[in-house]
């Protein structure tokens, strides 16, 4: 079985970065250690997942282009968005990692440092940006795979009608051109 890994892996960074964004916002509001560490763990896994999704997407892109019938502009936009998501996810990870390091090691005097609101704000902003970007990337990928809200994707069975009750013939004219 030659299963492309991209469709399998993509859901992990979407879930992890979106929940990580929520955890970062709660940390921003409360300053509680639990939420900082939760955001750090979620973004760590989400950034790795985003990188893996980007890498496997490269191979899938070649398969899709060989098959043809793909919207090249949308595919390119999805690819660019995925690359940007990886960058911002790792920037968010760095900011959260810095906050964790600072909280554990303390400030310049060696005393335990409290979470600075500025550090929390920057880390939360980057984490929420990564969550928004992964959502956009996922939306673009979903549009590539499943089509828009009103248009079926090329090669999909969307747009065909379900068999009616009784013996009436079923139309398989997907593009409504009469053939």
Predicted regions: what they are:
Residues 1-179:
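Polytopic transmembrane helical bundles with strong interfacial aromatic enrichment
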